[in-house]
Amino acid sequence: GKRPQKVRRYFMNFRYFLGAIISIPLLPLLYFQGKNIRKRIPKLPEAKNPEGSVNTHFNETLHLLTIGESTIAGVGVDFHQNGFTGALAETLSNRLKKHIQWKVYAKSGYTVKHVCTKIIPKIKERSFDMIVIGMGGNDAFTLNSPKKWISDIERLVHLLQINYPATPIFFTNMPPIKEFPAFTKSIQFVIGNLVEILGKELQNFTKNKEAVFYFNEIITLQK
């Protein structure tokens, strides 16, 4: 019912604010560590060629749309066919025995709010059979609260369902911030925990939505 959901949401927000209070003494440290990390890590370009197809010999075609931040944008990969979307299209094609026609709309550094305002209006195609979204890292880095995160997610889903009412929407699992070796222990602790909270909120949100799904397994870099 609604009451357990309210209690759960209150608990999630409480955990977030508790984490925020713990991190207040760390904020100047996080700020300087973040700046140093940005200087140390080269700014990698996003992948080229944001559309393509796999296994054109199959009779049936599935149109795939991927939306998101750096992983979907193919940061550090030369072409999208060698990145997340290309690999996903290949897997789907082999399992479903279908020709996959794919298109990527993504930008490194974007939050869900950015995606709603800057990416969704650019999507001109009127028909997709599957939508896959990869978000969470930037919302955690900007210390977005669970309440605001879900509000932004709700808006994103609403915008997509207006344009693609019958298309299933899949959210990928959250980025493994706690395992990124470039990040310091304090960044791993604060941002890593927040990413996990946002992931749990997203999981709860998708439970009550028709044709909206979340893959909730926590990623480790060994996978």
Residue ranges and their predicted role:
Residues 140, 178-182, 222-223:
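Short acidic/His/Gly/Ser-rich catalytic and metal-binding motifs that mark active-site loops
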Residues 164-168:
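A short helix->loop->beta-strand "cap" motif at the edges of active sites that frequently abuts
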Residues 179-216:
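Substrate-gating cap/lid alpha-helix
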Residues 63-65, 71-151:
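Conserved SGNH/GDSL esterase-like catalytic core that processes O-acyl groups on lipids
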Residues 1-65:
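N-terminal secretory targeting modules
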Residues 153-157, 199:
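Generic structural signal for well-ordered alpha-helices
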Residues 134, 172-173:
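Alpha/beta-hydrolase-fold catalytic nucleophile elbow
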